[in-house]
Amino acid sequence: MKKIVLAYSGGLDTSYCLKKFSEDQYEVHAITIDTGGFSDIEKSNIKKRALLIGAKKYKSIKSKKTYYEKIIRYLIYGNVLRNNNYPLSVSAERIIQAIEIIKYAKENNIKLVAHGSTGAGNDQVRFDMIFQILAPEIKIVTPIRDGNISRKNEIKYLEKKGVKIKWSKAKYSINKGLWGTTIGGDETLTSNKALPEKAFAKVSQTNDCKKITLTFYKGEVFKLNGKKMSPVKIIEKLSSLCSQFGIGRDTHVGDTIIGIKGRVGFEAGGPLVIIKSHHLLEKHTLTKWQQYQKEQLSS
């Protein structure tokens, strides 16, 4: 029986891949790379779902701290917003996820890896590129891209195979991480429609005002309201607070690596507040030429 490592998020796309591989007699190692965004309950449910659908082995790899140390803090240093709008919420974490997937495959001498990306966006390129650079000898399998499978047909297939899971938000492709959440759906395939409230992970709950204070040291946030804590914890707390107000929701339009326009909704209140605060602080402390050089480097 062939073994395959699947980058598994617990969502519809990767659940389809898992069931398809299982039905095709693969020994599936479903691996979740925890770059933040999931509660303990959600992580437990992802594991249960993977084993229920047919994974031979399941593992969740903690990479939240690595994600911050290797990537996020540099995005803060550079006040990085793609098209002055999008904080690279999910795109940035794909590198860490791909590296960990290949690392697991090599450690277990598995010659096949898979991801659930479609053929429309940048994620497919990010995964493929990292996989090919780090392990050109390992074959990449992409069922959804290769078969051009729609989400509607994925649900039909899973139901046909007896997977009785209620995909409450299957209409939307949702990717959650420490640096924000992206949401794709029918609305984002247009140029003028906005995502409805129900598409977001949390419904905004208040219209009240709340004052917060962030403290930075050498470009890194290390205090929230005067209380010292890790940058990761601050991002999590700030994101949770912002979601109550609906702060950080927007739609990004960009040019994909494959040459077409792409549109995606996102919610990244914590990241946006941190970046805007850091940028404002720099306006007060850096000279105009320091700011100019820094902007060139971050671009």
Feature locations, PLM:
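Nucleotide-activated chemistry modules centered on ATP-dependent adenylation/adenylyltransferase
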Residues: 1-299
